[in-house]
Amino acid sequence: MTQITLLTPDDWHLHFRDGDMLQETVPATARLFQRAIVMPNLLPPVTDAKMVTEYRERILAARPAGSTFEPLMTIFLTNNTTEQDIIDAKAAGVVAAKLYPAGATTNSDAAVKALDALFPVFEAMAKHGMLLLVHGEVTESHIDIFDREAMFIERYLARIVAAFPTLKVVFEHITTKDAADFVMSAADNVAATITPQHLLLNRNDLLVGGVRPHNFCLPVLKRSTHQEALRAAVATGSSKFFLGTDSAPHEKHRKESACGCAGCYSAWSALELYAQVFDDLGALDKLEGFASKHGPDFYGLPRNTSTVTLVKEKWTVPSEIILPNGNPIVPFFAGEEINWKVKTA
């Protein structure tokens, strides 16, 4: 197959950041994606309806002229979140609330420390039809970073899912066989997003031959057996798995430093990279479901009706992009050749 046409995809997990960065990130995503679930981990985090509304306006202002791209907004759960916060957020158009264990990712220090205390909030979310998006890692310092996802399932996620059978839960950016197996065996109210980097890479690509800071993300890349389990999961065509890039930009100097930031900025190449994965797996016929159908179906939103076409044509990801402030950012797969390209008129 040398050409494939898909319903226009959506990105069910990304980070736009804020300020000048929006002038880069919003157009990059709006290029191909009709909608995107926008993460709320700003400084300070987006915790209520007023902050959501203001952030959404800043995103809309950064859209290219004529764009119909729609940001789907989320709020950041803390131990101070109340049922009224959920009601107000829902009224403001928020579709989901994000659970970050404190310290699990960029700007998550304000996040949840005592998870059981949030059970009344989860109950309110189920009642009001708001989805729960989960960064599924424990954060205790003595637990090995490669084991934190599996431990979270065992300690917390299994209990949340069992306690709230009507709450829709998205296990975000899964990285392990444990997570893929959990989602596959769970009831229909549980789904997962998978990033391009976790399908394309494993921890050798982070650490062998030198540290590769632009492949560093959280949850961290795992061993190849986990990568293969994720690839096998998407190749099944199961509606429980859908596209979420976790595109997460940091300026070059913040990645290439003594304490580099976590995140892969994949917005400029994500759909093409997913196509490459599905092609390698002999499962191109499953790409449209993963990219364009399973996400809106799970969220209870209409599928897009427009289309995008990819052609099998090699191109090279730019080595860097200059941000509006003049600083460079290194995109995911910088300088690498990709086999699929978006067909332009």
From Swiss-Prot:
Modified positions (N6-carboxylysine) in chain numbering: 98
Gene Ontology BP term (one): 'de novo' UMP biosynthetic process
Xref: InterPro entries: Amidohydro-rel (IPR006680), DHOdimr (IPR004721), Dihydroorotase_CS (IPR002195), Metal_Hydrolase (IPR032466)
Pathway the protein contributes to: Pyrimidine metabolism; UMP biosynthesis via de novo pathway; (S)-dihydroorotate from bicarbonate: step 3/3
Active-site feature positions: 246
One Pfam match: Amidohydro_1
Disulfide bonds: none
Class of this enzyme: hydrolase
Bound cofactor: record note: Binds 2 Zn(2+) ions per subunit.
Reaction(s) catalysed (UniProt annotation): (S)-dihydroorotate + H2O = N-carbamoyl-L-aspartate + H(+)
Residues annotated to bind Zn(2+) 2: 98, 135, 173
Example of a GO cellular component annotation carried by this entry: cytosol
Binding site for substrate: 15-17, 41, 135, 218, 250, 262
EC number(s) recorded for this UniProt protein: 3.5.2.3
Keyword Zinc: yes
Binding site for Zn(2+) 1: 13, 15, 98, 246
Protein name: Dihydroorotase
Organism: Shewanella pealeana (strain ATCC 700345 / ANG-SQ1)
